[in-house]
Each structure stands twice: as structure tokens, then as C-alpha cells.
């Protein structure tokens, strides 16, 4: 028999040659043809290609070379020397050898001589280190087996590997791989195997030395056909005399290469040629014609191993090679879909099946691709009889994503990953809530969107931060219950039975307010979820054998998650069973970090045959579809620092110290993948990369191999100014995207109608932003006015306008915090103080109010929080004592019904009133807005009951110190007139935003009242500086724009708004509102 070598520039030519070979049947009609392929994607494409050429592809078995090697060496069912099997006995050897002198280096790395936390941390590396060493030993056996025989040339700092390997060989009851390899070679030379008479090895660009030796030996009694994609027969012939491995540093073959891309990207092919034995036959299947395009010229130059620019002039419409510089990954996908739509529109014969998209980092781009393509059912093209402008045409393109990690595709395995992360962490509020929001957990506990909103609110209000309970916190040196899940859940459950107003608590548990009766069942489900999660995390701790870890993880998933289909559970059980089978009956104990490392590796992305060539647009990593011809090949994400992969040299890898030709180098492998992609494109090659930072706009260079491609294209033609690079703007609605010829020749770049509308808007004539309101709304009907509505309006007149329109202003989203409070800011201090003051006024003692606040978990922990609570308690006690001094009678309620004239009335109830006094108290520093909230009810009492001498007493904190500030307001002589004027302001404020911000207008009127400069005082309150001013309030920003000046509020007076001494609306409205109040101030003692 013989070794037959078939070479071609593209794999479709090789496939046609393989079809011709298979058309000549074997003597045995029942014999199966065996074809070895490098990846699942190649297998799918090749089977379809053979079916197309032969009419049917049957009795052909596709396998990868490793499965054939396993069959030849008798390890098809179980290979004890595979890295995943070898790791378990290796772990045992390492554990038993840590005290040996030769193992000191490894023992130090694993913390054998450490104590406490450092010991636990380093011991968590055990599996990861053992698996890495198992991979190194397997690499030695596959690429340089002689090293395992004599360990010749091993550096002194790696001498421990020899002793470790020898101990491992004694532990495993099987021939070591180098001995097994030698025996297999002898057997193959002596006699034929049970394999088919004819075998084919298709599409490989790199084979380890041992596999080449085995295949060569196999060719002794079998016909072995090696179908090798090689870009240049000229280069092959030039290097044909260079044979045999040698140190890579001594390889000078690149000097004999004529084309720069073959020199920089084709090292893997050159080194493979050195390893191959002399074939019995050598066939080259070349192409006679190339497209008259830039891509065709490049491919023909590569085939000729020469740069031949003579007579070539690049045509502007030639877009056969496109390189797109974008602002980040998201923008790359935007550009990609526009490019693909353009290609599909220009060529009606082009179909999605003819397009291949490859990217080095599939997990980064997968969600972006899912959002950018294939949403036709989610984003309909039409809305009723109208075109939906938000629907991008690319949403009609169906996309198939391959190579995804199992934790991304299987929801139960995603839950497993979350559980392992929680088990080794602090169980923060956000982590637990994220788990609760996952689909399987929602299904198990019946959580709806409203339920999750309520649970999030409970978590926030109960001040849950991290840790399940005191025991869970103990490893962190924190053993108090506050801010734990146990603390918060107890508050929620207690809130089911009693409210916060009951002034009662159970031990350290203060009932949570607002747990309504219709949420009782949800509170139970929430508590059940947290309790089951706590038990699962407890089980996922300590040290135990692998099967116990997997049993505990399975039990936790069963308790917490429920898939809506059967396949996720079946796949999870299959994956766990495979892990257990590889480990065998090992009793080696593992830690949580070991199990994480194990599952992270096992559940990583892997290609499956069903994800390729399904008629849709295929998206995958760079490996599965390498060398497979497509009319359009797109490479996405060729960013500097991402491609080629940054493979840091493993300091323990003896091969990396002095690599030989033919040994694996992932950066060289990635360069070869780029060369394969260039040759696989038959019509168009599209490449995108991040050429500018999406936040700062700072320019970023392309990946080095991509830069080499761009430089080579510049010398492929006589056009020295050739530039295939398109630099895209940051935004998809930039006008360059829609102007014909701005980015691509003669036509607009984008197909997005929304981008066109936005571009037109953004490129229109620039003008000053129009005022939010140019004219007031029609006046409201002169209905009666409720006192409560009047009070609410004057809390913030500008916001009152938006409230009247049911207009929602921007607000800060209240999320949960994972940080335990060690201090409280001013707003939090006010919240706590106001609550304690209210408790004291409702009858609680200051000490009891302090105890209740401590049980809420809002204060810092331990003595720090207790001291803070004492300070707040004392301040609240002073305020309450001052208020109770004026509340010397029981509070009464007074109904008011006041005729304002013109058929309108002001109605409502004023309470509580203590004798002739309205007494209000606030924890805030007493200011104008607090006085105003007492002034309006005082006017109502004075107007409704004019025969009494009413007084409003306002109490609050002072600007400095602790002594409460007390202000008094006496009843005016004309309360009805003043109320009518307030109602007039109220009517005007519902028609337009009035220039009446509360603090600013009070400062203006106070300065006017005291004879100071009103504009200076008001500007201090309005303009933001060290602290936010009223110009930053959302309502004011919406009404007058961001960073509005005080003069923007000083608008000309309108008829009926005049006020003595004021020349603009801010001054007039400020004086109308505040001067009567300021004139009514009087001492209360």
C-alpha cells in the first residue's frame, strides 16, 4: 500500500478529488470509507459537497484523527493517559509526594508549608495545577515522546517533572503513552489493521509528530490519502528539500518565501511539510483562473508565492476585500449587518448559506449578533398599515450560532455556574436576586415580574446586603446578624403578622412595613427560595470526593430550578456522568475551587455538527469552518490584543523552553487561520476590528496580522494609494452612513430607515433649543380647590406642573446595595432621623426608637452604628421635647370651607391643631419649604375661623449646633386675599412651569425683605457648585434646560403679574409667595 498526497489551494478542489476517489468503490461493497476531518464544521460541509457531487454520501464514516489514533492504540473506550483521565491519579501522586525533596517546588506552589487562609487559598489550586500538568505530559507524549524516555536537556528548575512522571507511571497500570506509541508503530509495520483498505485524511494544516508517525506506519498496509490544503505549489517545491524537525530558532524557511503573507501567516504549513514523509504519489490540484478582483489578485499572488503588481489597477467599485474600523464590538455588528445587506442586495444569487461569519471571541459577540440579526418575529416589519421604522432589514436574516459554551445554552448548567459562584462568595443581595431572576428559578418558585419587583423592594427595605447568617459570615471575621438574609427574611415574615407601626419586635426582628395581605404567599415562597439556597450552599462547601460534589450540585439544582423542557436536565446529567466516568472510582478529595476549575473546563464552548451548514447564516469561532470555501467570509473582532490569542508561555512547559518545528504554537495557529480564511473567500472577504475606543474615541491599531494584510494589499497593485480600510463613525445615525459615496462608492452605507430619519434630524439647521413652553396651556376650569392639592403643589411648584400633566420625570432607580453600611450620608441620616422623630412623637421612648432603628439594619454595624444611633436619638429627643412643649393639649381637626370669590371655594381639613397652635416639627434643617407647609394651613384657619388668634409653630434643626430652631407665624389680617392669590399662582402653575423654585425664590424674597442683594442670594441657591443646586433638579432641567442660568428665570412680566419693586417674573412670584409669610414671622416665647 502507499501514502498518497493530494494538494490544492482550496478545499473545494480537494473535495472534488475525494469525490472522484470515492466514486471508485472498494472491492468489498459493504466496506465503509473512512475520512478523517479536523472539525465538525468541515465534516458537515464535506458530506454535503460529496452528496452534491456523487448524488449521495453514504457508507462514509467521518472521524477526527484522535479517534483513529485511540483505536490504533487500543484506547478508544478508555485512555488512562488522556489529560482528563490522567489528572486523577496525578492528583493522588501529588498529594502523596508533597513532602518529598524533589517536590518542594510544587509543594510551595500548593501551599503545603503554609497555614490558615493562605493554605486554603493555595490548596484550591490542586485540580487546576494537576490538570495543567496532565495537559503538559500529554503534550510531551504527543509532540515529543522522546522527552518522556530520557528527559534529555530538561532545565534544572523543571527536574521535578521527571520524578513526578515516574511516580505517575507507577500509579497507572498501563503502558505509558510513549511505550504504547512505539508498540503501535511496530504492530502497524508488521500487519494490517481492521480498518478499511482505503483511508483519507482531509483538510489538516497541522499534525503532531506522533500522529504523522502513526499515519505513515498505517500506510504500510493501507492506502492512505492525505488531502492537504496548501496555498502555493511554488512554495511547496521550494521547500521540498527541507525535511525533518529541528529547533524552531534554527528554522530559516521563511527566507525562501516570496510572498509576505506566506512568510508571516504560513508557518504552520511550512512546519507540517517538514514533518511529512516522502509520499508515494504527489498530486497538486491547482486553479487556472482567478477573479479579476483585488481578492483574486491576492490569492493568485499567494499561489505564485510572489507579489506581482504589474498592470493591476484597483477599481473603485471593487469591494472584494473590505476592512472596517469601528468603535467597539457593538458597532462592529452594526457595520457587519449593513455590509451583508449590501452584498445580498447587490447580488440576487447570494444567499445566507453562502456567508460565513467567524470571530475569535464568540461569547463576546454572541449576544450582539442575536440582537442585530434574526428578530423578524420579535420586531415586525409593519405596524398595522404603517412601516415599522425601528425594524432593521437584517432582522429577517436567520443566524445560527455555533461553539457556544454549555453554560450559555443550557439554563440548568447556567444555574449550576451561579450556584458554584455563590457557594464560594458572600451571597450578596445582587447575586441572590440575579439567581432568582433566572428562568429556571422563576419556574421552580413561580416568580412573576411583579413578584421579583416586590422581592427586590423587600430586600432593599429590609437592608439585606450579604451573607446568609452569622455562621456564613464567620470566615470573614464578621459575626453579627444585621444585613444578612436571615435578618431580612425574618423581618419580611414578621411583617406578615404585624406592622412597623405596632412598635413591637421579636428579639432582633423588627417587622417590615408594607407586607400586604395579598403578598403573604409570595413572602413564603421567597423565604423558601432563600432557605433552599442556603442549604445548597452549605452542601457545596468543605472537601469531599468528586461524586459527592456532583450529587450535591444536582440536588441543589433540582431544589432551585425547573426547566420548561426535558433536554436541559438530560444534557446536564449526561455531562456530569461523563465527568464521573473520567474520574473513575477516585476517592481524591476536592475543594470548591477545584470543582469550579473542573466544570469551567468541561463546559467550555464546543462545536456540534448540527450547528453548521443549515441554510442560515453561520457564526462560529475561527476553527470549525477553517478552509471551507464560502462566497463571503467575514472575520469579526480581529482586535489588537485579542487576535492572535495572547498565549502566555507556561513556565512549566519544557517544550516551550526550546520549541521544535511542528510543535503547537497558538499564535502561529491563529495566523494560519487568517491565511485559511483569506483563501476560503471566493467572492468577498470582510474584516472588522476595533479601530477606536467607543468611549474616548482614541485610535487603536489593528491586530498585527491584519496590519500585515493591509500592507500587503498596498503592494498587490500599482496603486500606491490603495486603501481598503473604511473608518466608520461612532454613531449609526451619522450622516456619512446615509450620504451616497461617503463610506462606500456611489451609494449610502446603511439600510436602516431609522438611521436615515435620525441623520436628517441631526444634520438639520442648528438653532437654539426652543423653550419647553412657549405659551401657557388653556386655563383650567374654575373649580373648587382642595387644601391638600394646594399644599402638594407648593412643595415644589415646578414639579407640580408636571404632576398636573401626569408627566413622568427622570428618577434614580432604586437598586439593592451589596455594601454593608459603615457610614451614612446626609440623605440616609435624614431618613433615619425623620423616622426616629416620628416614632418618638407617636409615643415611643427615645431609647425604644433607637432600638427599633438598630433593628432595621440601616445603621453601621457594632459600636460604630450604636454610637451613631445615640447621636441621632439625642437630636430627635430634643426636637420631640420642643414640639411636645407646644402640644400641651390633644390635637383637634378643623374643617374649612372658604369662599375665594368668583364662585370658587377652598375646602379641606386642618389637623392636628393644639389649642390655637399649629405645631410642625421636622428633622430637616428648618427652611422656607417647611414654613410654607405651615403657612397655608394657618391661612385657612384664619380665614375659616377669624375670631381666634392662630399661631403656627415650626420646629427643626438649626444650621449649626444641636439646639432646635423654632419659628412662629402669626395670622395675617387678610387671609382670604392671600389664599386667593395663592390659588391664582396655583392656577398659573398648572398652565406652565413657573419661575418659582422653592429654595431660590425663598432666598430672593428673604433678601428683598432684609434689604440684601436678591440676585446674589438667589443665585447661590440656584447654581450648582460644590453641592448640587436647584438648577440640577430634573423638573427644572426639563423646564429650562441643563445648566440654566438664574437669568433664564428672570423673564419679563406679563399682564396681571406685576408686583411693586419687581421687574421680572422670578422676583414677582417670589415676593407674592414669600413676603406675606416673612412679614408674619413672630417670636413664640
Curated annotation (Swiss-Prot):
Pfam families to which the protein is assigned, alphabetical: Exonuc_V_gamma (PF04257), RecC_C (PF17946)
Domain of life: Bacteria
SUPFAM superfamilies the UniProt entry points to: P-loop containing nucleoside triphosphate hydrolases, Restriction endonuclease-like
InterPro entries: DExx_box_DNA_helicase_dom_sf, P-loop_NTPase, RecC, RecC_C, Restrct_endonuc-II-like
Role summary: A helicase/nuclease that prepares dsDNA breaks (DSB) for recombinational DNA repair. Binds to DSBs and unwinds DNA via a highly rapid and processive ATP-dependent bidirectional helicase activity. Holoenzyme degrades any linearized DNA that is unable to undergo homologous recombination. In the holoenzyme this subunit recognizes the wild-type Chi sequence, and when added to isolated RecB increases its ATP-dependent helicase processivity. Unlike the case in E.coli, suppresses RecA-dependent homologous recombination, is instead required for single-strand annealing pathway repair of DSB.
Other information: In the RecBCD complex, RecB has a slow 3'-5' helicase, an exonuclease activity and loads RecA onto ssDNA, RecD has a fast 5'-3' helicase activity, while RecC stimulates the ATPase and processivity of the RecB helicase and contributes to recognition of the Chi site.
The protein's name in its UniProt record: RecBCD enzyme subunit RecC
Lineage: Bacteria, Bacillati, Actinomycetota, Actinomycetes, Mycobacteriales
Amino acid at each position: 500500500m502507499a501514502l498518497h498526497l493530494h494538494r490544492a489551494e482550496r478545499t473545494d478542489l480537494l473535495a472534488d478529488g475525494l469525490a472522484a476517489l470515492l466514486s471508485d468503490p472498494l472491492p468489498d461493497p459493504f466496506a465503509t470509507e473512512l475520512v478523517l476531518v479536523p472539525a465538525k464544521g468541515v465534516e458537515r460541509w464535506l458530506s454535503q459537497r460529496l452528496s452534491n457531487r456523487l448524488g449521495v454520501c453514504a457508507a462514509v464514516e467521518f472521524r477526527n484523527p484522535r479517534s483513529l489514533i485511540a483505536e490504533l492504540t487500543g484506547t478508544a473506550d478508555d485512555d488512562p493517559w488522556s489529560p482528563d483521565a490522567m489528572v486523577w491519579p496525578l492528583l493522588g501522586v501529588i498529594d502523596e509526594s508533597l513532602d518529598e525533596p524533589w517536590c518542594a517546588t510544587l509543594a510551595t506552589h500548593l501551599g503545603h508549608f503554609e497555614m490558615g487562609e493562605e493554605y486554603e487559598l493555595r490548596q484550591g489550586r490542586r485540580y487546576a495545577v494537576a490538570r495543567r500538568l496532565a495537559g503538559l505530559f500529554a503534550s510531551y507524549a504527543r509532540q515529543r515522546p522522546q522527552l518522556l524516555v530520557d528527559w534529555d536537556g530538561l532545565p534544572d528548575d523543571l527536574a521535578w517533572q521527571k520524578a513526578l512522571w515516574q511516580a505517575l507511571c507507577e500509579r497507572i497500570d498501563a503502558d505509558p503513552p510513549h511505550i504504547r506509541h512505539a508498540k503501535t508503530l511496530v504492530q502497524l509495520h508488521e500487519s494490517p489493521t481492521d480498518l478499511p483498505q482505503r483511508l483519507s485524511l482531509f483538510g489538516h494544516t497541522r499534525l503532531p509528530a506522533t500522529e504523522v508517525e502513526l499515519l505513515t506506519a498505517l500506510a504500510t498496509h493501507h492506502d492512505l490519502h492525505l488531502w492537504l490544503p496548501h496555498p502555493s505549489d511554488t512554495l511547496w517545491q521550494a521547500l521540498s528539500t527541507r525535511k525533518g524537525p529541528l529547533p524552531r530558532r534554527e528554522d530559516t524557511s521563511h527566507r525562501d518565501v516570496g510572498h509576505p503573507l506566506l512568510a508571516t501567516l504560513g508557518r504552520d504549513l511550512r512546519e507540517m511539510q517538514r514533518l511529512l514523509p516522502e509520499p508515494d504519489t504527489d498530486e497538486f490540484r491547482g486553479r487556472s483562473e482567478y477573479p479579476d478582483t483585488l481578492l483574486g489578485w491576492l490569492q493568485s499572488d499567494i499561489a505564485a508565492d510572489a507579489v506581482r503588481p504589474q498592470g493591476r489597477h484597483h477599481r473603485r467599485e471593487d469591494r472584494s476585500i473590505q476592512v472596517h474600523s469601528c468603535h467597539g464590538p457593538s458597532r462592529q455588528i452594526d457595520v457587519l449587518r449593513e455590509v451583508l445587506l449590501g452584498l445580498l442586495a447587490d447580488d440576487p444569487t447570494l444567499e445566507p448559506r453562502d456567508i460565513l461569519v467567524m470571530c475569535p471571541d464568540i461569547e463576546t459577540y454572541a449576544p450582539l449578533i442575536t440582537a442585530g440579526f434574526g428578530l423578524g418575529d420579535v420586531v415586525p416589519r409593519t405596524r398595522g398599515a404603517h412601516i415599522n421604522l425601528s425594524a432593521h432589514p437584517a432582522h429577517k436574516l436567520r443566524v445560527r450560532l455555533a461553539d457556544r459554551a454549555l453554560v450559555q445554552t443550557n439554563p440548568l448548567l447556567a444555574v449550576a455556574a451561579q450556584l458554584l459562584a455563590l457557594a464560594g462568595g458572600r451571597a450578596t443581595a445582587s447575586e441572590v436576586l440575579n439567581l432568582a431572576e433566572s428562568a429556571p428559578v422563576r419556574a421552580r418558585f413561580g416568580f412573576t415580574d411583579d413578584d421579583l419587583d416586590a422581592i427586590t423592594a423587600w430586600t432593599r427595605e429590609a437592608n439585606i446586603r450579604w451573607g446568609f447568617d452569622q455562621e456564613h459570615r464567620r470566615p470573614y471575621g464578621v459575626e453579627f446578624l444585621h444585613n444578612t438574609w436571615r435578618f431580612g427574611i425574618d423581618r419580611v415574615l414578621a411583617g406578615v403578622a404585624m406592622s412597623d407601626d405596632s412598635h413591637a419586635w421579636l428579639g432582633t426582628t423588627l417587622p417590615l412595613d408594607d407586607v400586604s395581605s395579598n403578598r403573604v404567599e409570595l413572602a413564603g415562597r421567597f423565604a423558601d427560595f432563600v432557605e433552599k439556597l442556603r442549604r445548597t450552599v452549605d452542601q457545596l462547601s468543605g472537601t469531599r470526593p468528586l461524586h459527592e460534589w456532583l450529587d450535591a450540585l444536582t440536588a441543589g439544582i433540582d431544589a432551585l430550578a425547573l426547566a420548561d423542557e426535558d433536554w436541559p436536565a438530560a444534557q446536564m446529567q449526561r455531562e456530569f456522568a461523563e465527568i464521573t466516568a473520567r474520574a473513575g472510582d477516585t476517592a481524591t478529595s476536592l475543594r470548591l475551587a477545584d470543582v469550579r476549575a473542573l466544570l469551567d473546563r468541561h463546559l467550555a464552548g464546543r462545536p456540534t455538527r448540527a450547528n453548521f451548514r443549515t441554510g442560515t447564516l453561520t457564526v462560529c469561532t475561527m476553527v470549525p469552518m477553517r478552509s471551507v470555501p464560502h462566497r463571503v467570509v467575514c472575520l469579526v473582532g480581529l482586535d489588537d490584543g485579542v487576535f492572535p490569542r495572547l498565549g502566555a508561555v507556561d513556565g512549566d512547559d519544557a517544550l516551550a523552553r526550546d520549541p521544535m518545528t511542528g510543535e503547537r504554537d497558538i499564535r502561529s495557529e491563529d495566523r494560519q487561520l487568517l491565511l485559511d480564511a483569506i483563501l476560503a473567500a471566493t467572492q468577498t472577504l470582510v474584516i472588522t476590528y476595533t479601530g477606536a475606543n467607543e468611549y474616548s474615541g482614541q485610535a487603536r491599531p489593528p491586530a498585527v496580522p491584519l496590519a500585515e494584510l493591509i500592507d500587503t494589499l498596498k503592494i498587490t497593485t500599482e496603486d500606491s494609494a490603495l486603501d481598503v480600510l473604511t473608518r466608520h463613525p461612532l454613531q449609526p445615525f451619522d450622516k456619512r452612513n446615509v450620504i451616497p459615496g461617503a463610506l462606500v462608492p456611489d451609494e449610502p452605507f446603511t439600510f436602516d430607515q431609522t438611521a436615515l430619519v435620525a441623520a436628517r434630524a441631526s444634520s438639520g439647521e442648528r438653532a437654539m433649543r426652543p423653550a419647553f413652553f412657549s405659551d401657557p396651556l388653556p386655563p383650567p376650569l374654575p373649580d373648587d380647590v382642595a387644601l391638600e392639592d394646594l399644599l402638594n403643589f407648593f412643595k415644589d411648584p415646578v414639579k407640580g406642573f408636571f404632576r398636573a400633566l401626569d408627566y413622568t420625570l427622570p428618577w434614580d432607580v432604586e437598586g439593592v446595595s451589596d455594601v454593608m453600611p459603615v457610614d451614612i450620608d446626609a440623605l440616609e441620616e435624614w431618613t433615619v432621623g425623620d423616622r426616629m422623630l416620628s416614632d418618638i412623637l407617636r409615643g415611643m421612648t427615645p431609647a425604644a426608637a433607637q432600638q427599633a432603628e438598630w433593628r432595621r439594619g440601616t445603621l453601621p454595624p457594632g459600636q460604630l452604628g450604636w454610637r451613631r444611633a445615640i447621636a441621632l436619638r439625642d437630636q430627635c429627643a430634643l426636637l420631640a421635647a420642643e414640639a411636645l412643649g407646644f402640644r400641651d393639649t390633644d390635637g383637634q381637626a378643623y374643617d374649612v370651607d372658604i369662599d375665594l370669590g368668583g364662585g370658587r371655594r377652598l375646602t379641606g381639613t386642618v389637623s392636628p391643631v393644639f389649642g390655637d397652635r399649629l405645631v410642625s416639627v421636622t428633622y430637616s434643617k428648618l427652611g422656607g419649604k417647611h414654613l410654607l407647609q405651615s403657612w397655608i394651613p394657618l391661612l385657612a384657619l384664619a380665614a375659616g375661623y377669624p375670631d381666634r388668634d392662630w399661631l403656627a409653630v415650626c420646629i427643626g434643626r438649626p444650621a449649626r449646633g444641636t439646639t432646635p430652631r423654632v419659628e412662629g407665624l402669626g395670622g395675617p389680617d387678610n387671609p382670604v386675599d392671600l389664599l386667593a392669590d395663592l390659588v391664582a399662582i396655583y392656577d398659573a402653575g398648572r398652565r406652565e412651569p413657573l419661575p418659582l423654585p422653592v429654595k431660590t425664590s425663598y432666598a430672593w424674597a428673604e433678601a428683598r425683605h432684609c434689604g440684601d442683594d436678591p440676585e446674589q442670594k438667589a443665585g447661590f441657591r440656584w447654581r450648582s457648585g460644590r453641592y448640587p443646586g436647584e438648577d440640577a433638579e430634573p423638573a427644572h432641567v426639563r423646564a429650562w434646560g441643563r445648566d440654566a442660568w438664574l437669568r433664564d428665570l428672570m423673564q419679563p412680566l406679563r399682564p396681571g403679574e406685576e408686583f411693586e419693586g419687581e421687574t421680572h417674573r422670578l422676583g414677582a412670584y417670589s415676593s407674592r409667595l414669600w413676603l406675606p409669610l416673612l412679614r408674619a414671622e413672630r417670636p413664640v416665647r
